[in-house]
């Protein structure tokens, strides 16, 4: 009986030196808010922006330094983020006003509770994420509307381009892993990334002069990650 117990308990061991790779589904749910759009420093009253929910595939690699302490790197396939106007910018004809690809790889330190040979292993983690955006595209309908705004209706043909600031964000995570055997497991985690960014829009007038607009957006997503893991 003692030998049988040892064999059984060791069948799920995730101990010091173990590596776990996980692949699964991520859902990003922004808890967003925004400041009004500013055009050349002038506030466009009752304007704002919001960000849609996103779904993507994610991968994580975890290395356990001890039976309980681990470091984890997490990255998702960058989802397409739609930004929609609110208030006076809420017209369906110009929305979403812009979209972009969001990159947000994260690095965390994690603490696993319970013994290394437990089937259920809850965990808490804290870390940092570097967030940046590329392939920023302005909706042509919004571009025409913005052109009319910045020229007081003189033209709707002034082209615009946009950029979004990169930023660092803290990451707070709670998770639970269930081990089927010494190799395979499933995990679920919920993370929170509080961060804000600014979008900058440059509109070029027919004269060649440029008009600068910007909007500050607090994104603050809650990220759910459901995954299958393999230990080696």
Residue ranges of model-derived segments:
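Transmembrane beta-strand segments of Gram-negative outer membrane beta-barrel proteins
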Residues: 15-29, 221
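Outer-membrane beta-barrel channels and translocator barrels
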Residues: 16, 66, 78, 114-118, ...
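Residues on the lipid-exposed face of transmembrane beta-strands in outer-membrane beta-barrel proteins
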Residues: 23, 59-63, 73, 107-111, ...
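Sec/Tat signal peptide C-region and signal peptidase I cleavage site
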Residues: 9-13
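Repeated loop/turn-to-beta-strand initiation elements of outer-membrane beta-barrel proteins
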Residues: 19, 68-71, 117, 184-186
């Amino acid at each position: 009986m003692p030998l049988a117990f040892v064999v059984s308990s060791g069948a799920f061991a995730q101990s010091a030196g173990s590596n776990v790779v996980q692949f699964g589904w991520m859902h990003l749910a922004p808890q967003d808010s925004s400041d009004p759009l500013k055009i050349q420093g002038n506030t466009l009253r009752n304007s704002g922006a919001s960000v849609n929910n996103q779904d993507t595939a994610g991968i994580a690699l975890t290395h356990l330094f001890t039976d309980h302490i681990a470091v984890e790197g997490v990255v998702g396939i960058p989802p397409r983020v739609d930004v929609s106007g609110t208030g006076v910018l809420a017209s369906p004809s110009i929305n979403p006003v812009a979209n972009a690809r969001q990159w947000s790889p994260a690095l965390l330190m994690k603490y696993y509770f319970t013994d290394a040979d437990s089937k259920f292993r809850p965990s808490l983690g804290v870390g940092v994420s570097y967030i940046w955006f590329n392939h920023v595209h302005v909706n042509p309908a919004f571009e025409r509307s913005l052109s009319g705004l910045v020229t007081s209706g003189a033209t709707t043909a002034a082209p615009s381009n946009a950029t979004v600031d990169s930023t660092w964000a803290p990451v707070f995570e709670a998770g639970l892993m269930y081990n089927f055997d010494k190799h395979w497991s499933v995990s679920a985690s919920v993370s929170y990334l509080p961060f804000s960014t600014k979008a900058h829009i440059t509109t070029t007038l027919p004269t060649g002069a440029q008009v600068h607009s910007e909007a500050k957006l607090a994104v603050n997503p809650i990220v759910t990650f459901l995954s299958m893991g393999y230990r080696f």
